[in-house]
Amino acid sequence: MTKSTIDMFKNDVRYRDRIAHVETIPARKASYKKVDNLNPKIVDYLKSKNAKLYKHQSETYEAIQNDENVIITTPTASGKTLAFNLPIMETMIEDEDATALYIYPAKALSNDQLHVLENLEKSLDIKINPNTYDGDTPKSKRYDIRQKSRIILTNPYQLHLILSWHHQWKRFYSNLKFIVIDESHYYKGIFGSNVAYLIRRLKRIANFYGANPQFILSSATLANPLELANRLTGEKFRLVDNDTSPSGEKDFILYESFTFGGQTVSSFIRQSETEIAFTC
């Protein structure tokens, strides 16, 4: 938010008496950390993108390398997805039979991740055949997905249906290395309880086929991330919650008004094109 916008609110008689609080969060520089013994393909990928791993990404990477279950709760746009995708890709490179299951609460989210995985597959020159497997997956494609895909993206509703047919998934379950539960803050209340039982069924089936997959949870900021992760999966977790990505300076005005309407919003627009107003 520009200084002129803040000054306008502080000085204009129409607004100044309704300002509850003004807060400025200073800019933050990125903090990086190198991961030792990266697979050469991962090293080449990062070089091709002219990218370095933030410290929280490296901590996530190292925890996954050390066979720990991880929950990462850094903010949106901090690189959570890359933090867990790269170590999973490294396992896929080094173990050609390894598989991973990504669970999303909404179809749109899984489609977004599918595009990310397809780009990684191409960039790393590996064969993982990522696919979504849900209610919209054509029956004509389901057999090939079960037999050939190394990363499958699904949702709790579809997972509930396919667990009973686990004999059709023997190849996938017997090589299952990772279970990724993204947007895990969705799983609360009755829905969360049902998904927790579903995850326990999934674990039992994976164990039946000789697999003991790692869990990777990604979430928005939570008050009790370790408790959520444990209740959802029954496992112990390593928490990564310190955001080390760069951030610009941010200004917040908490404004008390029962008539926060067109006039106030138009004042924002006249001052700058970069402000966002939240009303409730």
Mark where each language-model region is.
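Helicase-associated low-complexity/disordered flanking segments
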Residues: M1-E59, N66-N69, I128
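Walker A/P-loop NTP-binding motif
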Residues: E62-N66, T81-E96, R200-K203
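Conserved helix-turn-beta segment of the N-terminal RecA-like "Helicase ATP-binding" lobe
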Residues: L109-D134, R231-F237
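Conserved ATPase-coupling elements of RecA-like P-loop NTPase cores
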Residues: Q113-L114, L161-H167, E183-L198
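Conserved helix/coil segment N-terminal to the catalytic DExD/H
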Residues: G135-K177
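Post-DEXD/H (motif II) to motif III coupling segment of the RecA-like Helicase ATP-binding lobe
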Residues: H185-S245
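Conserved interdomain linker/interface between the two RecA-like ATPase lobes of SF2 helicase motors
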Residues: S218, L222, L226-C280
